[in-house]
Amino acid sequence: MKRVVITGLGAVTPLGNGVKTNWRNLIQGKSGIVSLKGFPEYEQIPSKVAGVIPRGKEKEEWNVLDYVDQGKLREVATFTQLALTSAAEALKDARWIDIDEQEKLATGVCFGTGIGNLDDALNENGVLNKAGIRKVSPRVISKILINMPAGYISQRYGFTALNHTTTTACAAGCHAIGDAFNFIKLGHADVIIAGGSESCINPLTVAGFSKARSLSTKFNDNPKAASRPFDANRDGFVIGEGSAALVLEELEHAKNRNAHIYAEIVGYGLASDSYHITAPNPNGDAAYYAMKRSLKQAGLSASQLDYINAHATSTKLGDVAESIAITRLLCDVNRNPEAFPVSSSKGSIGHLLGAAGAIESVYTVLTVQKGVLPPTLNFEYSDIPQQFQCDYVPNVAKESRINVALSNSFGFGGTNASLCFKKFLQ
C-alpha cells in the first residue's frame, strides 16, 4: 500500500498570515482573539469576542490583494480568498507550482468548510427585497457554493486529478485531509492539496451560535481569556476565521523529486455519535472509536502514541467527553492519562469551524517535526473528574520527543474524525 507524506504547509489565522508566523505566535502563547464591542451590529448579541485575522499590509498581516486581483474581489467570497491564500503558501513550500501537464493530471484538491460565507447570501437577499431581481448579482450562487475553494484552487493551478469538497461542520478540514490521504493510497492522485477554510464571523452566525448557547459570554471584557479549553471556567467556544492547507504526496513521488518531508500521515479514523445534533455523547464513544480506528489504520497501538491535539473547543460538555475518550484509549494499554500530553490550540485562535481540523493538522505536523508541544492557553485548573484528566500543557509550550500524534476534529451532527501523523523515517 502506498505511503503518504506531508511536503507543504500554508496557514492564515487569527495568529497571522503564514505558517512561520502562526507557529511562532502559537508557541509563544499569543492570542488572536479580539473584542467585537463597538460594532453596532453585535450590540444585542451576548457573545462579543472572536478570533479575527489581522488584516493590513504589514508582513504578518493578510492583504487579500496579494492573492486575488482587485477586479476579481467581487466574484470571490472571503472563505475562498482565504483558501487561495493558504494554498498558495503550501504549494510554494512544497515546490509544486511550476509543473508540467502530466503532473497537473496527477494533482488534486480536497478542501472543506462548514458554513462558508453567509454575508453574500444575506446581502443579495437584501438587494432582492429592496431593489428587485434586476439588481441581484449573477455571481451570487457561484460565490456562496461550498465547493468554490476547491474549484478556484483547481482552476488557478490547473490541477485535474480530482476536485473534492467536504462539508461536515467542524470536522470538514480534518475530513478533507483524511479523504486526500485515502485518495492517494488508492492511486487516484500522486499529490493533493488538502485543507479547510472558513469566514463566517457575522451577526447571524454569532447570534445563531449564541442562541444555541455554544459561545463564550463571560469574558467579553477580556477577550484573550475567553477561549479556555479544559479549564473549569470555560463557558463556550470563541468563533474564529481562517484557512490552512497541506500538500499530501505519495512517498516515492516525493523522494524522486527530493521534496522536503515534514511528517508522514499514517491513519484516518471516523465515527458517528448517533446521539444528538449539537451535543456529544457524554461517554465519548465516537471520539474514542475515531482515534482507535486512526491508530488501527496506521498499524499502531495507543502505547506508541506521544501526543494528541484535541478538538476541545472550550465547551462544558465537549471537553469532558473528549477527555473521557482519550483516557479510555490510554487505559486500554495501561497508560497514565495524567502524564500524557493533550493540548488545544483553540485557546489561541478560537474555533475556526470547518478550517479547524486543517490548521490543527498543520500544528500537529509541526509538533511532530520540531518536538515542541503547543500550550493550552488560559488553563488554570480543571473541573473534569480527576480520573479523566490529562496533562493539558497549560499556558507554556514544552519540548518533548514526538514520534506519533493524533489530531481530533468533531462536529455538529455527530461527526467525528481523527488523523494520525508520524515522524518520517525512511
Curated annotation (Swiss-Prot):
PROSITE patterns: KS3_2. InterPro entries: 3-oxoacyl-ACP_synth-2, Beta-ketoacyl_synthase, Ketoacyl_synth_C, Ketoacyl_synth_N, PKS_Beta-ketoAc_synthase_dom, Thiolase-like. Its EC number is 2.3.1.41. Residues 1-18 form a transit peptide. Keywords: Acyltransferase, Fatty acid biosynthesis, Fatty acid metabolism, Lipid biosynthesis, Lipid metabolism, Mitochondrion, Transferase, Transit peptide. GO terms for cellular component: mitochondrion. The active site is at residues 170, 311, 351. The keyword Transit peptide applies. One of its GO terms (biological process) is fatty acid biosynthetic process. Residues 19-423 form the Ketosynthase family 3 (KS3) domain. GO terms for molecular function: 3-oxoacyl-[acyl-carrier-protein] synthase activity. Pathway: Lipid metabolism; fatty acid biosynthesis. It catalyses: a fatty acyl-[ACP] + malonyl-[ACP] + H(+) = a 3-oxoacyl-[ACP] + holo-[ACP] + CO2; butanoyl-[ACP] + malonyl-[ACP] + H(+) = 3-oxohexanoyl-[ACP] + holo-[ACP] + CO2; hexanoyl-[ACP] + malonyl-[ACP] + H(+) = 3-oxooctanoyl-[ACP] + holo-[ACP] + CO2; octanoyl-[ACP] + malonyl-[ACP] + H(+) = 3-oxodecanoyl-[ACP] + holo-[ACP] + CO2. It is found in: Mitochondrion. The keyword RNA-binding does not apply. Belongs to the thiolase-like superfamily. Beta-ketoacyl-ACP synthases family. May play a role in the biosynthesis of lipoic acid as well as longer chain fatty acids required for optimal mitochondrial function. This is Putative 3-oxoacyl-[acyl-carrier-protein] synthase, mitochondrial.
